[in-house]
Structures are given as structure tokens and as C-alpha cells.
């Protein structure tokens, strides 16, 4: 069967198009790919594989230029043919939601995979493994899914005329957007609209997911990130409205925040993170909130966990803790709420529903810098930046490391170095490699060496989280943590 015929057959079987639409669909494909593809045969069977072959044929026919951007734009346009229009997607979602919220979520997730908005083939390239630590198993991922632009495209992106449409990659205006060299193609993108605390919000999946059913809840308006009482209201509303999903927010300050601070949004999904499994190391109750279970989590970062069947109690207590933290200083342990009227304190909040109760984890953050730590006092320090130097955002806070692609090859080089092979180790890894070699001087087994290096990456990630922790895992640090808790006001169990 010809490539075009096979692709169109798939489109008809997996959409609302009918056999009568075959000629129309064929012409839509030819208009995008080029009529020279009409007689091309294929042995492929899967829809996304057929789409990929059509894209390569378009490059061969010079219908599109040979670039990552052009490929992505055409690919999204082709997959838009199997994607219902936004109003239909929303109608279907809410009609199903009325009798089964779980099924509505599952159907939207399946659509977002089927139409290649979620890049399953790319995500499958990621390296993922777990390592033991003093805080339970941590999750390590080396992110290989996002395609890197070639140098010509990077230059082209710098030369392109500035545009503020869409204003950012999280705006509703991305739905159906054609794409350009410095903004991703979104022809096949769909967003579920819903009302939350009196405002319109959107629900979508992340194209390059870091974990199972990784999704984004985004403000319908382009407003900056802000941690406030409303954040807690919204996060708890999300876990109530989207069963089985957690919801969390990046902090709203530089250094301790995520990569996008210009558009308010939360992340969620169906995944149990290491932090969720971490137990309380100290339990207590806050005065005036006796019905809320509370405690400090055994975790490298500084986490207060609140549990209750009352959303209102959780919101009120979380807001009280946030307000106290924003103005709290303890110079004895290098904690300052502000310097020169610049605020340093905020919270990374995570909400979930567990055993019928609502749970909030509040991670205390401080974005101070100093002469000794110019990148951040509570940020990965210089000696671990060869593994992770970027901000510690929501996902890392919860115990899942997102490490750069360079580490795939570099980890293998260090393993080769440990078994005595003549390899060049990156300068920034040399001290680490020498340290591992001194600990394992007689290694000859490459697989064993690789396992040692990967475990060491995990141990370094635990150190990264400890660096980001405001209260250290020492007697002094934990005593200071309790001073803050007492400032909020507690009743000891």
C-alpha cells in the first residue's frame, strides 16, 4: 500500500472522518508533503511512524527545508488531522467526566499520545534508574528526549523578528499554533478548559513528560507565578477534581523557582515520588489547628507535611506558615527573610489526596546568595555542579533528578576510566573520577564500573538536595527547624 493511502486509512479509522473523506484527506496530505509522495510505498504500519516517513519525504521533495523546526511543524500539522477541534475535545471530556472523571482523564491522555502531542518515541530514549539513599530510593533520569536544534537553527532563531504571540509557551494561544524557529509547533495541541476558584484555567499534558501522565495546569491569563493562599486553594481543588493526580507548584522566586516564572501554572500527574514515600521524622500539631496532622518529613530539603480531611483547615494553616516563613529570619543558621528589601523566602507546595484525606507538603525555600555561594546558598554548590547546576525545581524537590543529555556519554567515559581504558574525562569530572578510582582501584568489569558511577550520580543528587535544604540534616539544623515551627505555634504530641 502507498504511504499516503496507509496514512489516510489510519486517519479515517482513528478520527471522526469517514470513507467519503478519503480524497479530501489525500489532497490535504499532498498539499503539505508534495505530490511527489503519491506513489511512494511503505512497509510501516503505525500512525506515528507513517507520519515520520511523510515528513522525511517532504524533506526529500524539498517541500520543507531540512531542519528540526520544519519537521516538527509539518509533523504537528499532519497529526492535527486525527485530532478533534478544541470545542469537541472539551465537549467529549466533560460529557465523560459527568459519569467517570477517571475515564475522561484517561481518554484525554490517550488522545494526547495518539496524536503525537506527547512524544512517546522521544521520551523512550531517556535513561531512568533508581538509587538507594538515606532518604529512601531516589529517581535519576538523564533527559535525552528533547531534540537539540542544529547551529543553523540557533542562528536563525536569533535573527527572527521578535514576536509576543503567543506571549509564552504556556498561554492558551498555543492551541493550534503553527510554530516558528523560536516557538514550538502546536497544531495538534489541545487544552481542557475548567473553572478553578472563579477563574478559567487549562489542563494539558507535557509533550516531553518526565514521569507518568505528566500534566500542566495553566492560568487562562498570562500572569506571573505567585505563591499565595490562592495557590493552596487551587492545588487542593486540582487533586479533588482530577482523581489520582498530585499537583505541585514551583516557587515564585529566582534561583529556587522553575524555568518559567512569567505564567502562573502547576504541574501534576499520576506518579508516586520518593518524597511522598518519606515518613515523618517528627510529628506535632499546630495550635488552633488541632485537627490537622503535621510534622517534619525525613527528607534532605526542609518539608512540613500537613494532613486533614478539611481543605479549609489546610488552606488556613498553609497560609499561616507561608506568611510566617516570608518574614522569618534566624541569622545563627544563615536564614534571612530579606536583604536590602529583596525578599528571599517562599515555598514549593505539593498537594495530593491519600487514603481519602488531603495532604500538603510545604517545602521551605530561601534564595539568598553570598560571596562564597554566588549561585545560591541553598542551591547546588560548586563541587556537585558537574552533575547538576540548574535550579532545583518542583520535580527535583520531590526526588526525581532531571539531568542533562551530556551525562549519558560522560558517565560512560568515567566508567571506562575506572577500568583503566585510555579515555578523556571531562575536566569538571576529573576530581570525581579520581576519587572513585581511589575507592575502587582494582576494577576490571565495565558493567560493574558503570553501576558504581551511576550509584555515585545518585549519591551526588542526594547531596544536591541537601544543599538546597534550608535546614541541614544536623542537630543544629533540625533544632533551628523546630525554632521556626515553634514560631508558627505548636502543640507537641
From Swiss-Prot:
One of its GO terms (molecular function) is UDP-glucose:hexose-1-phosphate uridylyltransferase activity. It comes from the Bacteria. GO terms for cellular component: cytoplasm. Pathway: Carbohydrate metabolism; galactose metabolism. Keywords: Carbohydrate metabolism, Cytoplasm, Galactose metabolism, Nucleotidyltransferase, Transferase. Belongs to the galactose-1-phosphate uridylyltransferase type 2 family. This is Galactose-1-phosphate uridylyltransferase 2. It comes from Streptococcus pneumoniae serotype 4 (strain ATCC BAA-334 / TIGR4). The lineage of its organism: Bacteria, Bacillati, Bacillota, Bacilli, Lactobacillales. The gene is galT2.
